[in-house]
Amino acid sequence: MIDTSIPLVDLHRHLDGNVRVNTIWELGHQHGIALPADSLETLAPFVQIQGKETSLVAFLKKLDWMVAVLADLDAVKRVAYENVADAALSGLDYAELRFSPYYMAMNHKLPIEGVVEAVVDGVKAGLKDYNVKINLIGIMSRSFGQAACTQELEGLLAHKQHLVAMDLAGDELGFPGELFNDHFKRVRDAGLAITAHAGEAAGSQSMWQAIQELGATRIGHGVNAIHDPRLMEYLAKHRIGIESCPTSNLHTSTVVSYAEHPFRTFMDAGVLISLNTDDPGVSAIDIKHEYRIAKSELKLTDAELAQVQRNGVEMAFLSDSERKALYAAKV
């Protein structure tokens, strides 16, 4: 099902959406933070999706617990380190870990630039102990408004040498992409690649805006592109990658069932599309789970799954030589 001759990658993976349950428990107790459960065993349902529960509100509540315990920069560094470990232990050859320093900082008023430094330090420490390639993507969380995103951007750009790209995430309907055109001009001027969450809560126009105005060469989720034939044609022609996260889309009620997921529609239209975990800690999944789902629920053949694996490597924010090195390591 997973072709071991092709690098296995996860390009849409939120570092702040992947905090271990035991880490939430330990950090909560270490810092005197009231948790919603009185044992490690009973904590899991408050921080992870259980069964077929699907609601954006419930999903976001669980996500909030993951950053609620980031009481100091050591906690941030620990979570970053464990993200590298989890990527390696799940069998990934390469992962792009994205994070919103404002979101991670806000509960305990941590310095935004300090959060970025702690993430970088934690990842570096993880890479010494685990054999996996990692790159970082900075997120601007649009839900907190333009001024907060400016603070976030400045903290991230201060460490741009440790980033490969910038992302825009959060409330797509309440804070449309055009509010952040100036922010992304600074991103482009800094020489970073751009991806954006778009076409998830809003329609295809949000994706057009992200591509044409923000400068996105990849789109996170993008499920609503299928209602715009001209956009689908554009995506295929210009090799704009779709970072698809089927289980997360189900958990957030972006789609009502796997059967309704548009993954197959993208593939049939020749759009470059990859499989990703999104918030693996909240969804309690790993990348292999997404490939199993793609086979059993999305009805992809083994040949199609291999193509999806290759797509991920092609879409990655890597140089050609780095891509070749990933393939060479699989021989």
UniProtKB/Swiss-Prot annotation:
EC number: 3.5.4.4
Gene Ontology annotations of biological process type: adenosine catabolic process; hypoxanthine salvage; inosine biosynthetic process; nucleotide metabolic process; purine ribonucleoside monophosphate biosynthetic process
Keywords: Hydrolase, Metal-binding, Nucleotide metabolism, Zinc
Binding note for cofactor: Binds 1 zinc ion per subunit.
CC annotations in GO: cytosol
One Gene Ontology molecular-function label: zinc ion binding
Positions with a binding annotation for substrate: 14, 16, 170, 279
Stretches assigned to coiled coil: none
Site feature Important for catalytic activity, where: 221
Cofactor requirements of the protein: Zn(2+)
Active site per database record: 200
HAMAP family listed in its UniProt record: A_deaminase
Function according to Swiss-Prot or TrEMBL: Catalyzes the hydrolytic deamination of adenosine and 2-deoxyadenosine.
Record's protein name: Adenosine deaminase
Organism whose genome encodes this protein: Shewanella sp. (strain W3-18-1)
